[in-house]
Amino acid sequence: MTISPRDEQNRSVDLWFAYKVPKLTKDTDSDSATGYEYVYYDREIGSVQKSPNRMNNPKGALFYTLDSIFGDPGSTTGWILYNDEMPADADRSNNATLGHTKGVIAFDIASNSALWLLHSWPKYTSPSAPGVPTPLYGQTFLCVSLDLETAGKIAAQMALHQQPQVYLPRTAGLDHASPLYTLTQPLNASAPGDSDSLDFKTRGGAPFKVIAKNRKWGKDFWNDLVGPTLKADMDVETWIRGKIPPILDSDGVHKTYDIKFIDLRKLGAPWAWPETQDHAKWGITTTDDWVCVGDINRMVTQEKRGGGTIAFQDPQLWKALSQTDLIVPPPGKTEAQARAMIHRTHQPAD
């Protein structure tokens, strides 16, 4: 059995991205939404498109991908599920000292294949009941293909830096010396993790970076690590419910702006919403076409949590997302007014 991301027609692809819409009531800025609609992108279709599917129905890339893993797994197929808020059937308490991380690593030993689904949805997912939790907020998903060696390198980084809260793993005969197996075991909370950037390629040869930090690093992930690593100014959308770090990056050159409004209407989808209705964790650089999809927020309190993002250059996806964020200002506002709004509402760290 070959493990790979599945697209909207249940075909194997190298990667896909999806942005789930929050639950919305119809107003002058947006159509109503149930909270399960989404836009979808992969490099085969080459553009971000409004999906005809919903995430609470047995169709679409997310459903097909997880069903290919959990539906009828062979003896050599396994998975590592992790989330900072676990589903009910995980039957364990959340551990706030572990990473603010959410995702799935699935693998098949016999076919030397794997995938990584990194997302922002709390309490998701479960092998026995891979349904969907709350529709209230916007969420992001990125799924990429891997081979076992690459999956192992990512697992080794995660064990040391992100330190995810793993639940309901299926090891499927993994060698106990494998980093994938190690990730399923209790993690060393005193591990001397710092920050890290790991380059990897998908099975299709597409280059990516995993940028990650350990909770002991003690700095803002986006401001002090991602922006300087990519050497660019950034616009970042995350869940903000508290004090925000400074706008100026630690390198004293680049800036990180917090997105205040998401507008999908230029992409042919009839939805727009403020960041207060968004739980996604993504960012784009203002130059060089970098896209980041992650699982950690830009808040001072998150400096004490591990987490990471997948960064990659994709001109089509970058162009689409750059049209949806604060650069397309809220209705009736210019770009300059949108930037000024960020400065006015900003709560810098003490």
Curated annotation (Swiss-Prot):
Keywords: Endonuclease, Hydrolase, Nuclease. This is Putative deoxyribonuclease-2. It comes from Burkholderia pseudomallei (strain K96243). GO terms for molecular function: deoxyribonuclease II activity. Unlike their eukaryotic orthologs the putative Burkholderia deoxyribonuclease-2 are probably not secreted from the cell, as they do not have a signal sequence. Its EC number is 3.1.-.-. Belongs to the DNase II family. CDD domains: PLDc_DNaseII_1, PLDc_DNaseII_2. InterPro entries: DNase_II.
